[in-house]
From Swiss-Prot:
The gene is cyp11a1. It is found in: Mitochondrion inner membrane. It is a peripheral membrane protein. One of its GO terms (cellular component) is mitochondrial inner membrane. The keyword NAD does not apply. This is Cholesterol side-chain cleavage enzyme, mitochondrial. In the ovary, not found in early vitellogenic follicles, barely detected in postvitellogenic follicles and abundant in post-ovulatory follicles. It comes from the Eukaryota.
Length: 514
């Protein structure tokens, strides 16, 4: 549930051409020592920024021919190595400037204005226009965005709401553990080897559904009712149909009646229908029982009772939060388990930290979350090496100068998250998975931007962080995570960065006393 929560973080602009002939080599791509522009104090023109930007359509064709769309992240690393810490690109009609050094976003974010604007997902806005539905806060801009965001911040991202979320998310985490124990028992081998991607998808959807809608979908059960299964299918179909429409205008697909557009509409209809059912259930519960016994009813019910946003505004924003908080969170957890399986000694360090926190707090989960810095560092390290989004973007509202280059107002500027995570000038030994690097006291400013920054940072950040931390606590307390083979898994771009092949993990129960 990170920067989209997903799409909040997903880069939808297309990096410049120059894709290496091989899809990738066996080693992890690392940014080499970046080139620097002329050190003179003379500010250079926008047209002097290096890069491939003079023929956008030719670049688009070359990019498509070289399968660059699935390798956007590696292309960006290649381009930073070729052009230096700043370069300009034009792919089709997308014209942008790309930056990599952590001191650069400080300048960028100062120029984002009162109403920060980033690229929107045209497929999502096209559906809402087609169905005459309101935009949620993820897709809004201007004063309408700001007024909605201020209200939602208090209910979703304020530190004060953490106590509301923890009991709900902790319950889902415990149910996931129980589900894994059942899988191990049924295997008859005292272990369970599987690709966890679908299980983690269900876990993430159950978690975010519990917090947002205040009800369980039942995805941790062996039998999933048809209504919940349809909801899962709609979420999956929505993501599957979004990615191709990044490159083909949805309006054109709608005019020709393309199946991908019809499927996209069907998927969103199902997602919004789920929100409608939840709203009806909430009103029914409020009429029947005014005493909630102190239990947090969920974000949707809280916003309805607050009565500061219209029902349609609430439904739109909550639906976007839910849609953006599934794949992003589940993929980050999958990469984290993958890295812990590759580093068993580190896994034991995290397990020991969790054990100390459990003993010190007598199991008070809210207090435990304050005592697991290495676990939190592991999640930051995962987002450094395996970010869900390729880049973080802003349209600047004033002229700025970066690396002695003038960048005019209105330009789309992108910070390469994937590339920065592999820059040895920013992260020593970038190829190493080292959660301890986040425990240091030196300046880490603008180095961990997986959830974005400033007023337009990921709205679901508090939910996502809590959900992932609780998941790791429960998994570390109950299972040892192993990998079958020492095979390195790379990323591929499909709206977000995903493992390019299944990650097989083996879960073994910890024996009593371990």
């Amino acid at each position: 549930m990170m920067v989209s929560w997903s799409v909040c973080r997903s880069s939808l602009a297309l990096p410049a051409c120059g894709l290496p002939s091989a899809r990738h080599n066996s080693s992890m791509p690392v940014v080499r020592q970046a080139l620097s522009p002329d050190n003179s104090s003379t500010v250079q023109n926008f047209s002097e920024i290096p890069g491939l930007w003079r023929n956008g359509l030719a670049n688009l064709y070359s990019f498509w021919k070289l399968d660059g769309f699935r390798n956007i992240h590696r292309v960006m690393v290649h381009n930073f190595n070729t052009f230096g810490p700043i370069y300009r690109e034009k792919i089709g009609y997308y014209d942008s400037v790309n930056i990599i050094k952590p001191e650069m976003p400080a300048i960028l974010f100062k120029a984002e204005g009162h109403y920060p604007k980033r690229l929107t997902v045209e497929a999502w806005t096209s559906y809402r226009d087609y169905r005459n539905r309101k935009y949620g806060v993820l897709l809004k801009n201007g004063e309408d965005w700001r007024s909605n965001r201020v209200i939602l911040n208090r209910e979703v991202i304020s530190p004060k709401v953490l106590g509301n979320f923890v009991p709900l998310l902790d319950e889902v985490g415990q149910d996931f553990v129980a589900r894994v124990h059942k899988k191990i028992e049924r295997s008859g081998q005292d272990k369970w080897t599987t690709d966890l991607s679908q299980e983690l998808f269900k876990y993430a959807l159950e978690s975010v559904g519990s917090v947002l809608y205040g009800e369980r979908l039942g995805l941790m059960l062996d039998y999933i009712n048809p209504e919940a299964q349809h909801f899962i299918d709609c979420i999956s179909l929505m993501f599957k149909t979004t990615s191709p429409m990044l490159y083909i205008p949805p309006a054109m697909l709608r005019r020709v009646g393309a199946k991908i557009w019809r499927d996209h509409v069907e998927a969103w209809d199902g997602i919004f229908n789920q929100a409608d059912r939840c709203i009806q259930n909430i009103y029914r519960t409020m009429r029947q029982d005014t005493n909630t016994h102190g239990k947090y009813p969920g974000v949707l019910a809280s916003l309805l009772m607050l009565d500061k946003l219209s029902i349609e505004d609430i439904k739109a924003s909550v639906t976007e939060l839910m849609a953006g908080g599934v794949d992003t969170t589940s993929i980050t957890l999958l990469w984290t388990l993958y890295e812990l399986a590759r580093h068993p000694d580190l896994q034991e360090e995290l397990r020991a930290e969790v054990a100390v926190a459990r003993q010190s707090t007598q199991g008070d989960m809210l207090q435990m979350l304050k005592m697991i810095p290495l676990v939190k560092g592991a999640l930051k390290e995962t987002l450094r090496l395996h970010p869900v989004a390729v880049s973080l973007q802003r349209y600047i509202t004033e002229e700025i100068v970066i690396q002695n280059y003038h960048i005019p107002c209105g330009t789309l500027v992108q910070l390469g998250l994937y590339a920065m995570g592999r820059d040895p000038d920013v992260f020593p030994r970038p190829e190493k998975y080292l959660p301890s690097r986040w425990l240091r006291t030196e300046n880490q400013y603008f180095r961990s931007l997986g959830f974005g920054f400033g007023p337009r940072q990921c709205l679901g950040r508090r939910i996502a962080e809590t959900e992932m931390q609780l998941f790791l606590i429960h998994m570390l307390e109950n299972f040892r995570v192993d990998k079958q083979r020492q095979v390195e898994v790379h990323s591929t771009f499909e709206l977000i960065l995903l493992p390019e092949k299944p990650i097989l993990l083996t879960l073994k129960p910890l024996k009593s006393g371990q």
